[in-house]
């Protein structure tokens, strides 16, 4: 396949994936929406699904489907197994939605995917906490409905539970490293940053979708999973660093969100890099302005980052990281097709959103 054909194939996969969402909503709501006792709650679930699971890039969910297609020989890709792969892909997207709805409340965010955060909508507020729980429990309802008879059912349940736990541990590290109103720059070390990123982002964004497809393709060996994890966690680290960079230097019309890392006192890659390079005077500027809500203080931190040319530091890091990941793919991809990892790398490097 040449580049254009690959793009067309990907666009088709994406379209099929998005079209499957109506079936997901139907399966989760159709039976009980007219129920005399819980019908109203199911109407709310439908609304929650339709507002929060849609509008992203669908990279995580699509990764399940694309990896499944790469791993399973065409003759065994019958309509039922493809339906299951699409559904498990949507389970990953629902996990993402569960995290994002919760995360936006914790970070006091305003927009997500180019629209108002769910909890910010009139009449929603902190009821969004329970809505997030609904998104999470929908995952296990779908897995039961579609995969209960499959030999990999338990592997998938354990994988989703483990990924949720790891992400929640990462979020805990993130929150305790950046308590609101208590700026302690000494906490922002490279070591702590890497731990946050590995647990909060890399497991569920990169390992989970590939591992899910591996289990569905009958690949359950520890060695194969450990090797895939080695590559995917590194990719996840790069992806989060890129996200931190785009939080401040990205274009909100592209990213769909307005970054809040500076005012939220976050242990971001940019602040870690700044601290590694700062003179005592520059550190003082950071101390006085970081983690504060005032627009002029946020602007002062951004000006400091620009003064220290952190954009150039990032560009160099992106280059080095890409080369490092290519080396890992060469070393650890087999027996899986390298195309799985190369396709993911292609999607994330040089992205703008």
UniProtKB/Swiss-Prot annotation:
Ligand binding (Mg(2+) 2): 103, 107
Positions carrying N6-(2-hydroxyisobutyryl)lysine: 57
Keywords, alphabetical: Acetylation, Cholesterol biosynthesis, Cholesterol metabolism, Cytoplasm, Host-virus interaction, Hydroxylation, Isoprene biosynthesis, Lipid biosynthesis, Lipid metabolism, Magnesium, Metal-binding, Steroid biosynthesis, Steroid metabolism, Sterol biosynthesis, Sterol metabolism, Transferase
Catalytic activity, EC: 2.5.1.10, 2.5.1.1
Residue sites binding dimethylallyl diphosphate per the record: 112, 200-201, 240, 257, 266
Record GO terms (molecular function): (2E,6E)-farnesyl diphosphate synthase activity; dimethylallyltranstransferase activity; metal ion binding
CDD domains registered for this protein in UniProt: Trans_IPPS_HT
Binding site for isopentenyl diphosphate: 57, 60, 96, 113
Binding site for Mg(2+) 1: 103, 107
Annotated site (Important for determining product chain length): 98-99
Cofactor requirement: Mg(2+)
Cellular component terms (Gene Ontology): cytoplasmic vesicle
Cofactor binding note: Binds 2 Mg(2+) ions per subunit.
Recorded superkingdom: Eukaryota
Keyword hit for Cytoplasm: yes
Modified residues annotated as N6-acetyllysine in this record: 57
Regulation: Inactivated by interferon-induced RSAD2. This inactivation may result of disruption of lipid rafts at the plasma membrane, and thus have an antiviral effect since many enveloped viruses need lipid rafts to bud efficiently out of the cell.
Family: Belongs to the FPP/GGPP synthase family.
Subunit description: Homodimer. Interacts with RSAD2. Interacts with bovine leukemia virus (BLV) protein G4.
Function of the molecule: Key enzyme in isoprenoid biosynthesis which catalyzes the formation of farnesyl diphosphate (FPP), a precursor for several classes of essential metabolites including sterols, dolichols, carotenoids, and ubiquinones. FPP also serves as substrate for protein farnesylation and geranylgeranylation. Catalyzes the sequential condensation of isopentenyl pyrophosphate with the allylic pyrophosphates, dimethylallyl pyrophosphate, and then with the resultant geranylpyrophosphate to the ultimate product farnesyl pyrophosphate.
Protein name in UniProt: Farnesyl pyrophosphate synthase
Source organism (scientific name): Bos taurus
């Amino acid at each position: 396949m040449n580049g254009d054909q690959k793009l067309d194939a990907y666009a088709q996969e994406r379209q099929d994936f998005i079209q499957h969402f109506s079936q997901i909503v139907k399966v989760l709501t159709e039976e009980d929406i007219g129920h005399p006792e819980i019908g109203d709650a199911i109407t709310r679930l439908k609304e929650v699904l339709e507002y929060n699971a849609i509008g992203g890039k669908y990279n995580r969910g699509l990764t399940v489907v694309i990896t499944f297609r790469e791993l399973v020989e065409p003759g065994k890709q019958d309509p039922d197994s493809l339906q299951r792969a699409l559904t498990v892909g949507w389970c990953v997207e629902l996990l993402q939605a569960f995290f994002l709805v919760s995360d936006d409340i914790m970070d006091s965010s305003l927009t997500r995917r180019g629209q108002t955060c769910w909890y910010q909508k009139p009449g929603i507020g902190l009821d969004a906490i329970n809505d997030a729980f609904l998104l999470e429990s929908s995952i296990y309802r779908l897995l039961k409905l579609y995969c209960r008879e499959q030999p990999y059912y338990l592997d998938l349940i354990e994988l989703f539970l483990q990924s949720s736990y790891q992400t929640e541990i990462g979020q805990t590290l993130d929150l305790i490293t950046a308590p609101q109103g208590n700026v302690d720059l000494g906490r922002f070390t490279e070591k702590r940053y890497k731990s946050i990123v590995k647990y909060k982002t890399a497991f569920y964004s990169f390992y989970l979708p590939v591992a899910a497809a591996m289990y569905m393709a009958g690949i359950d060996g520890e060695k194969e999973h450990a090797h895939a994890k080695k590559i995917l966690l590194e990719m996840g680290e790069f992806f989060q660093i890129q996200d931190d960079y785009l939080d401040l230097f990205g274009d909100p019309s592209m990213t769909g969100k307005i970054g809040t890392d500076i005012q939220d006192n976050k242990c971001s890659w940019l602040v870690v890099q700044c601290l590694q390079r700062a003179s005592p005077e520059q550190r003082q500027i950071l101390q006085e302005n970081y983690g504060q809500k005032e627009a002029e203080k946020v602007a002062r931190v951004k000006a400091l980052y620009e003064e220290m040319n952190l954009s150039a530091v990032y560009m160099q890091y992106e280059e080095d990281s890409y080369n490092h990941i290519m080396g890992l793919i060469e070393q650890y991809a087999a027996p899986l097709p390298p195309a799985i990892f190369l396709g993911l790398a292609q999607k994330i490097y040089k992205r703008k959103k």
